[in-house]
Amino acid sequence: MASTAKARYNVGLKLYTFLLLLLSLIALVLGQEQPVHTITPFNNLPARLFFFDDTEAAIYHDSIDGNVYVSQDEGKSWSMAEGIPKGKTVMVIEHPFDNRYAFALTDSKIHYRTEDRGKTWRSFEVPVPPALVARPMSFHSDPKKWGSILYQGTACNRQGWGAICHDETYYTKEAFSDTPQLLLSETSRCQFAHSSKDFKHEAHSDLIYCVAFDTSSVDGSHALSSSRLFSTTDFFDKDRKVEELGIGKNAKGVIAFAIVSKYAVVALKDLSPSNDGEMLLYVTVDTNTWAKAQFPHASSAKLRENAYTIVESTTHSLAVDVVLQDKSSIGTLFVSNSNGTFFVESLKDTNRNDMGYVDYEKLYGVDGVGLANVVSNAKDVEGRGARKQLKTMITFDDGTTWTSLRPPSQDSEGKRISCDPADTDLCSLHLHSVTTPHNYGRIFSSPAPGFAMGVGSIGESLLPYDESDTFISTDAGVTWQMVRRDAHKYEFGDKGSILVVVNDEDGTDNVRYSLDLGKSWLKYDIGIKFRARALMTLPDSTSQRFLLLGQVARKDQTKDTGRVVIIQLDFSGTRKRKCVEGDFEKWYARTSKTECLMGHKQWYKRRKPDADCYVGEKYMDPVEHEDNCQCTEEDYECDYNFVRNGKDCVPVGPEPIPAGVCTGNPDQTYKGSSGWRKIPGNTCVDGVKKDEKVDKKCSQAQPAPGEITHQIHDFKHQIVQHAYFKNPKVKTILVRLMDHTMWQSSNEGYSWTQIHPEHRFLAFYHHKYADDRAYLITDTDTFFYTTDTGRTWIRAKAPTPPNTFGAQVLHFHPNTDNLIWTGNRGCSAQAQSCHAEAQYSRDNGRKWSLIDSYVRNCAWAKDAELNTDPNEIICESYRDKKGNQRLFQNENPMELVTGSNYYANKRKVFDHVVGFAKFSEFLIVAEMIPERRSLELEVSLDGIHFATGKFPPSMHPETHAYTVLESSTKSLFLHMTMSEAPAPFWGNILKSNSNGTYFGLALENVNRDERGYVDFEKMIGLDGIALVNVVSNPTDATLSGHKQLQSRITHNDGSTWRPLTPPVVDSQGNKYSCEGTKCALHIHGYTERMDPRATYSSPSIVGVLMAVGNVGETLAPYTESDTFLSRDAGFTWQEVHKDAHLWEFGDSGSILVLANDEEPTDHILFSTDEGLTWREYKFTEEKMRVRSIVTIPSDTSRRFILFGSLMRTPGSIAVHIDFTQLTSRKCDLSTDNPAKDDFEMWSPSENRPEQCLFGRQTLYHRRIRNTDCTVGEQEKAASRVVLNCACSKVDFECEFNHVKNTNDECELVPGTTPLPDSDTACRNGEEFWYERTAYRLIPYSSCTDGERPDRGREHRCPGFKSHSAWFWLFMLLLPFGFTALIAFYYYRRSGLARGTIRLPGDGGRPAYGGDTGVVATLASVPWFIVGVAGIAWEWVVSHVERLAPGARSGYRNLPIDEDAQVLRFEDED
């Protein structure tokens, strides 16, 4: 018994000993697995906290105290930087290419440099303090030139109480060991061309780009037009070049320059007179060739300053986010082709904040994968200010397609989520992104391959940050798991083998970490409670140590912690075994449907999730491996000289070939481009070979120099509609045939393709405001649209079939995504309620909303020049909305209804209207007055308030038909029919004052036809010049029915009209049979044209007119007429060819083409000297009847299309004629040395008695008539106003109720009264007002002083002007003392004083001239003084400028029309 007990004792003892040893071992193991930490206190949060690349050295910059701290052991211990005085540092900048160097900048001229990663610091001196920009230093990327650095500083010259400052850039070649030398003054940014490892090019190693001003400034301000991009290869010693960007002298207004990935990008503001603030981007990939970035929807995607962001881009695509609506924080993401020039829409409604940051980030190291947030309720946000609802989208193919994030099926506790993951519209994962940053560095990913984390929520849209949870993806975003409840900061370490998170919603005293890719989590207590502010590690995520930045509440602070702490977390002891080869796996990126991108699959070597080991490859970035894929169609793009047309690439013209390949044999072939090329950088092999050369006939090759070529295409049916896209860079034309088929040519008629043969097309529309958009209307509710000039056509659904009531189907808006569709509703057979219904879309037809039913016409009130509510819609709407609309008569009147907020707030404006129209800045409504059975003309300048038009006696519209004519010179032109039916029609032209309310007689007996069209045409490019035909025999024509027409021209906007001066001899040198004062030139006008686009003049050739007519007493029949030309805006004419011809201008007038318009022909005539000599080109053996000659709308191309038909063949033919090889020399335009270029200066006033036109003498550039060169697409030189002229009689017209008598003087019409006098001028700050006379100044004239027949007796304006100038100067300066105190307070509070964390960005202090001096100060004056000070300032400026030497009067701006008192809204805001 005792032995048994002893045995049991021994067994128990051994078991006890074993358990004791086991517990000790477990304790030992557990002790080894625990991380360790150290805590270092600081006074303030850092402005910068960073590691030197691939080192353990770190920098902590406290900008509040102005101190720099250094750690040499990954943040375990910290010490103040040796060699830098306390409290001096305002900025720390590390060298991006040399990890030994960093620079501590002060606000003085003395700064500090380390070349040993912060161990020691030495001072250096520069001539000026640093500029207030985000990065005042630029570095060279070449290891041999890492000492080359550019430094931007600010130089100031004190003047009185203030200082005049400008920025200067200095350079050093030895990292400031040498004396910095001045590079360039008046700069806003300079950068080495070699400053990015991805921007690879062969340029000079010292090439530098600078955005600087080409003029110096006394007061520190500059005109934006003086900002240019300069370059140099010798630090501006002898080499100083202005980068012309391929646009010559127009490369001005440069806002910014940046190098992004492999692209250099320049942003400049379009300073052309017609521009409305658009920004232009120019891109280069080789520093030699710059190209303009082309966006698919021209107007909609206009870049505006502070309204676009170049986001993170790849080496094969540039990405830009553009704000399409004013004052919006919603954008559209565009991605480019491989050379960064042609962009396509990638993602709509992207979320961005007011600072321009966009919710878009690419996953690090994984090609093609990116995350973005979109605003799912964009319409409500922009329409009624609703709160944004954000959804997260992901792309795996570089932005080509986007999908929702599929959520996990379970939460972090294993419970099923509350929605169905299969329904991604209502149940998807959404993540907080760039606009709400919650850590340093990248938002989602790190260099750890394939790992991504985020804070977000599952559901229909993103929840607020403090209601979100933490998620992880280990396969680059394909799948996600919830790893922690609540929002956390997160970081990856040891190439992803360690994950660390810390609570980011509240204070905490611990962190969580995972060693198995987030499957399980361990807790580690820190020992103090803090609020996490940042969590970071080495930039390459290869370390096992982390830095946790925390803020400690006052109640939790101790003497060892302070209010800010840096906690180093060391996980190096948690695992003892280093991973070996068997612990790794091959991980392929993008395991979604699209594994290949840019021709290869991408894979990394990554630790297996369950491997219990550490990677330990510190400072070694993950190595990317590529497996090449077989080539597919996605690996190719259009070759040079080819453009996309649907699924094909078609040539823009004949292909250039090497000399000697084609020897003249018509059947000979050559190896030419297929139209495709492999995308540069693409590595695919085998598979589809779209870039192989193909056999082509030599007849298709580019002709030899001097030769003309043609190509004929047969259409089986008649052409009923054709039009080019308006974009001058695009050569695409659309054609619709009688059989309802659509055809397209992307190379100016050289080749043709049919668009969607399976559909019948009723019409097509080009977008009025977007040069790249067009819409094809079918006979169903399907329509097609393009946003890239026809390269792709997108199918869309309309809310209804197109209407059959004769109304325009589509109406457009300057915001190009806004559309109005008018279609049929309930119009099936035997329908009793068939009517027209209008709906609007704000997303280019994706979604539609009802406007109104039973309408005849609905349109946007907003127009390019009509300044109305952009969301207002105007409708002609029937009062009674029932029954069949086709049967409506006058008993159901048509009302005019306007509705703001997209017709939500409707308002009936008129009870009975005939219709409305928009012309220039005028909205015109024809109102029916049933009780008087008459018409009233109502005019509005804002779409809300209307004024009734006032007409001379006997010319009121109540008894006459009228036509509103083209109006572009701040006045309305109206043709009012004066003849009675059924006699031939003619009438009077009336012209309004500048607000469209008072109409005066301009010309009597002007011809019109039975359709209401008028022989009236304004000249393109020169305002105020117009041609008309008048009926010279109105009395006889009433009886005989035969009108005799004569032509008239005006050069002062209708004030006076003269006959056209005939040439002395005809085109054969013979004198005309008609002689004497009754003989004049008469030309056929608008009413006789088959194509109304065949205008007398061209937008590309200022001053040139062509017409068909005759010299005689009256106009002869068309077939008895000849062809005439004027080069001086109609002052003189010459006959250029016998017989009537169609004509077209090409290459800005260097080519003029004629085709016989009297009979079929087999040839054309062309001239290269504007009609002095003619040559013939035969293009067919069988004669054709030419119906029209067309070229691109800008008339800058050298290719033409003849549309017509053969005599014995049904259908139509299109003849493409190419003059590109006729002349090879490009015209030289030199505004600096005009005597030696190919252009001459010309003024419209050269051949007229008066020197000036509209009160100014203007000079234009035009090509010398007989020079042999091609103008091409080079930018035209701007016109130049030489001087503003003194007013003369031609600058005035008759006042309302006045007409000219036989002495050419204005007199009051008998039985009428003149307008009452008005002191309106006093509202504009004038000192005097004048009584009315019989004359008024033509609104478009800018003349000054001189004769003023419009001014009667002078009266002094009442009010403020009775005080002296010195009184108002004193009143103006009085508030400045208070302003200085307020300004000083805001200086201390705003961050401009040293000691704040935030530093201004590059755009923080613009150097461009704007509101400077006193005007800028007015913004700080207390509100109750602004009214008085503003009036005083206006008075002071007007008088000081009048006295200042060299002051210019310039153009007068009349914000209130001189006749404004007739408007019912004159005193309304």
Swiss-Prot record:
It is a multi-pass membrane protein. GO terms for biological process: Golgi to endosome transport; Golgi to vacuole transport; protein targeting to vacuole. Belongs to the VPS10-related sortilin family. Residues 1-31 form the signal peptide. One of its GO terms (cellular component) is cytosol. The gene is VPS10. It comes from the Eukaryota. Residues 32-1364, 1434-1469 are lumenal. Residues 1386-1412 are cytoplasmic. The keyword Repeat applies. This is Vacuolar protein sorting/targeting protein 10. It is found in: Golgi apparatus, trans-Golgi network membrane; Prevacuolar compartment membrane. The chain crosses the membrane at residues 1365-1385, 1413-1433. The lineage of its organism: Eukaryota, Fungi, Dikarya, Basidiomycota, Agaricomycotina. It holds the Pfam family Sortilin-Vps10. Functions as a sorting receptor in the Golgi compartment required for the intracellular sorting and delivery of soluble vacuolar proteins, like carboxypeptidase Y (CPY) and proteinase A. Executes multiple rounds of sorting by cycling between the late Golgi and a prevacuolar endosome-like compartment.
